[in-house]
Amino acid sequence: AVQQLYGRDSPYVWRRFGLSDESIISAQELRFSYGSPDDGKIVLDEVLKGININIRSGEFVAVLGHNGSGKSTFAKHTNAILTPSSGKIYVIGIDTKDENRIFDIRQNVGMVFQNPDNQIVAAIVEEDVAFALENIGIPSDEMRKRVDEALKTVNMYEYREHSPHKLSGGQKQRITIAGIIAMRPKCIVLDEPTAMLDPAGRRDVIETIKMLNRQYGITVVLITHYMDEAAKTDRVIVMDSGTVILDDIPSQVFSNVELLKKIGLNVPQVTELVYELNKCGLNLDSHIITEEECVNALKTILKEE
């Protein structure tokens, strides 16, 4: 309520609720173009068009957009898989074009992709979680501790001696997340991590992500096309054609139903219901995004009648 009253960027809000104003990711006039051959020439296709995004420590941010909006390209800039064609992106204060600091960036910002099979490299779950730790020379005692803690955190400790390839899609994705958090990152960027999962797998992964943010203070950037996932975050950024068109708390963003539909996006089911009821003559708050809020609003109207 206070966030809505004072606005997402109010210093009051961040100090009052113990949220840091430390910037984890800062994109400044970020532009990026892919080059493709055409009749012997390289043709540039600008995918990011001078975007400005600042993500603070401890935030849980969803980035939405239709295919081709630039959201996944932005995600790949957050740990220097891609670097800007122009403009800057700073991660934990480091310019991602500084080749001498790539290791520091990737230690602090872990990435999880759509298909967990592409990130699983070992035949045993605990060995997979330990893989990156071995590569950076973590001592064996510390490695054992981190692997166990990471698996317990994502509720996969009992599967530590299993083959990852025999697990469900949701379980595999949680193993991938365990491998990331064993590195003790400040931020996790997830690029459509539930796109290939069934509803149960999606729910498990999203609950794990929420827990990492709420209990451990890990900054989370969730690239998704599921509106109901985005509605559970602190902040929603909407991209279209390489630009940022909306950036606010979920209830404020999703109240722009017609704009979102115009760029090919849906809204959460509850928001859609409220929108349709209002078209039929009811006067419900357009910022409603949860079932509880909707039920309470309808009860109030029924009592008045």
Per-region residue spans from a language model:
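Helix-to-loop junction immediately C-terminal to a conserved catalytic motif
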Residues: 79
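Conserved ABC ATPase signature
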Residues: 163-167, 171
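The feature captures the beta-strand-to-loop junction immediately N-terminal to the Walker
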Residues: 64-66
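Conserved ABC transporter NBD signature motif
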Residues: 87-97, 105
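Conserved ABC ATPase "signature" region
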Residues: 141-159
